[in-house]
Amino acid sequence: MIHQSSLELVGGTPLLQLNNWMRLHGLKANVIPKIEALNPAGSVKDRAARQMILEAEKAGLIGPGAVIIEPTSGNTGIGLASIAAARGYRAIFTMPETMSVERRMLLKAYGAEVVLTPGAAGMKGAIEKAEEFENPANPLAHYLTTGPEIWADTDGHVDMFVAGVGTSGTVTGNGRYLKEKNPAVKVVAVEPDASPVLSGGKAGPHAIQGIGANFVPGNYDASVVDEVFRVPNDAAIAAARALPKAEGILIGISGGAALHAATELAKRPENEGKNIVVIFPDNGERYLSTVLYAE
């Protein structure tokens, strides 16, 4: 098949059972990540980006000559910049200055403009109205694509779904779909221990880029979340550093957080023999200048 647009390449990412990792940690549950780095612009955010732009076009909100202005913690902007380029739109993104240099460079590589906001303000400092944290097209993308892919690829044998929460589109959309298919599926939201707002704690600075926006997103649907799992900075970094040596797969810091959570969940006796599907949002190459690879 010859595809006619890069938009057609979004989704359809594979599941991979981490057999080496499971042996290394003595796990009796199956840890099965979905490798979202294989999307065309390199992350899970390609899904929401495509859906948001297509929904905006359908609603007549954007058309030829339009300018897309969005706040982003990085991957969303990269996905939007890619889709915007393919659809012929100009794109401008606001993002905290603390985000990795690689992310800024990638945005510019797609022809987007970048406006940096003070890092101390976190994502709140980059928020404008009508953004991804509130946009219903964000969870819809996962309800329509990621969830059905997981269900089909596991033949419906998914017992637990684990995902980090940034905008919350991934956990909300997948949670809704999977629980419609089987209400017994457990959905686990992962957040930074240093900024545990989903579990009622106080917002604070943390090192896990891509999750933990320091506020509860409008798209977050607590009714589909069975557990909120808090991950310390060092645990996320340690998992992200260890996985490539065990499995030959590079992941980012938020993927490390999700992997740490999934690993701890797999150690629980009640989860023996269960399939734990976890989202790996992107590739570790996006974080070469960060604490993840600091000497």
Predicted regions and their residues:
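PLP-dependent amino-acid enzyme catalytic core
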Residues: 1-295
